[in-house]
């Protein structure tokens, strides 16, 4: 029996994990084992919201060392993280400034300024990327405007996964799927767009040409002295999650559910027409030249903040209490910018309900109900937008990532969207990370080949839409009201 042992480092906004994957060639089976799990989160430092990259690096090394201490031969390592954030280095490879997080307020007003000076349509035609106030394009402009004293010292700008790969190997790389999240990569050339870079104030010399997933960046030398290849996987965690989504046919959509919810479909060509621009659709890079045509949704970040503020430790109990409440009494727009990083999430949610003359969610369960119903309704709206964009309805939705364990939200999503939902795999980003490593090791042919492995080894659960549910009736009522308004217009 031939085995491959691959290690995936998967960093999310709230936690990170080092996972060991064992692939058996003859039976094409893949098993995962968690080696080390650790917390991640936002920190306040010198007036900025930052990441503790030193702590994250220590946790990564601890996890890798644990694998080596077990005497396991590691065939390769891959790292994926969230998008848009970066670390600046000087000529000697030392950090310049702070690793500022995307939830920091330093970019306030800069997205509007870019649209005014460059033109919203021109930016979109160049990048194909949705407008989000924390995109790297605006973060770099904030840096160069607010901290000009740092500029003479900067030699390199590495996105988060590339930074951690650099720390392991001493080699620099700019991986394509994550680079596209910056809104700085030209959608036609797959290279940095000089006009957008110039507006940001960044020097093009800070960046190398983006490389597509699958190349070996360099080698990590383990404590035993072995050189282990570090592979440039699809290093944006959503890109990895989509690779592991067992999409079957052109009518399948995906929803990567975690701190963020990212809903979309795969395409061989980008969508950059006026309809896509109006809907703020993004065309992020994927593996094998595919595009991830999707939309960002604020996701379970709202719930995470409520759990933290209310000191709730028993999530299953909260979900059970939430499920017992009537649906759609408290509805908010989870994508409202006021929810990006408020001082108090509970108070912000209550304020929106108060301002819109709705009942006020007071209890933990009511806040949970508000979040779950609002997310499911937004999922339905976004899925409808995506279907209109491509001119074909979807027949099923694959929910992957940690959020797919929330069976209540899965059923609400199926009911609101009116289509079959398939939940799983949970560790989608980790699996997609492993998939690219196995392709680099010549164990698998391509993404479709890997998805067959996932379909046969992952635990998948199907949720059938219930047209008689409260949320389904609510959606039908909304559609009827919209149609009436359109007829009367």
From Swiss-Prot:
Protein's GO biological process: glycerol metabolic process; rhamnose catabolic process
GO MF annotation list: ATP binding; glycerol kinase activity; rhamnulokinase activity
Top-level enzyme category: transferase
TM ranges: none
Tagged with keyword Plastid: no
Gene3D superfamilies xrefs: 3.30.420.40
Needed cofactors: Mg(2+)
Catalysed conversion reaction: L-rhamnulose + ATP = L-rhamnulose 1-phosphate + ADP + H(+)
UniProt binding sites for substrate: 83, 236-238, 296
Keywords: ATP-binding, Disulfide bond, Kinase, Magnesium, Nucleotide-binding, Rhamnose metabolism, Transferase
Amino-acid positions noted as binding ATP in the UniProt annotation, renumbered to this chain: 13-17, 259, 304, 402
Domain of life assignment: Bacteria
Pathway annotation: Carbohydrate degradation; L-rhamnose degradation; glycerone phosphate from L-rhamnose: step 2/3
Subunit note: Monomer.
Known role: Involved in the catabolism of L-rhamnose (6-deoxy-L-mannose). Catalyzes the transfer of the gamma-phosphate group from ATP to the 1-hydroxyl group of L-rhamnulose to yield L-rhamnulose 1-phosphate.
Protein name: Rhamnulokinase
Lineage: Bacteria, Pseudomonadati, Pseudomonadota, Gammaproteobacteria, Enterobacterales
